[in-house]
């Protein structure tokens, strides 16, 4: 963000809205998980959005994180090296994003490289890391480190199987959208305009 001037008007309002979505409590949970999950010592940043961004900005921590979710020798990011060059840092971030997508994160849940590198949308970075953690817990392959309660529980598939007889019986049931054949009916009523028969 050093090369960008201040935002004004609508751009400023949009940026402020995005910045309000950032969760400081979630930041602490993510830092705790990342330091636990990484096999190497990746350090620990001071609290704050900018410190969190600077910690993740060069991509080495993210690459160590995604490698920690795979067994030894099957790491998706082979070469991790700290660099001060902008393009090297962005390349490592994009390697993490590609590996996260292969791991199973939806493309719509993944942040853009500039969201992290320029600090444009750190809330989106948090959401991606939360989805990654939740998916790692749901996989239950023994490679997740940390407390599973840090992440929302993913729903599991619960298929229903019906026999042919059950499916055939279902065709005989009148759906409630069609009305019902029980309860009040017009049985015993006289037609319109006819006199009532009182006996």
Curated annotation (Swiss-Prot):
The gene is TAGLN2. It holds the Pfam family CH. The lineage of its organism: Eukaryota, Metazoa, Chordata, Craniata, Vertebrata. Calponin-like repeats lie at residues 174-199. The modification N-acetylalanine is found at residue 2. This is Transgelin-2. Residues 24-136 form the Calponin-homology (CH) domain. It comes from the Eukaryota. Belongs to the calponin family.
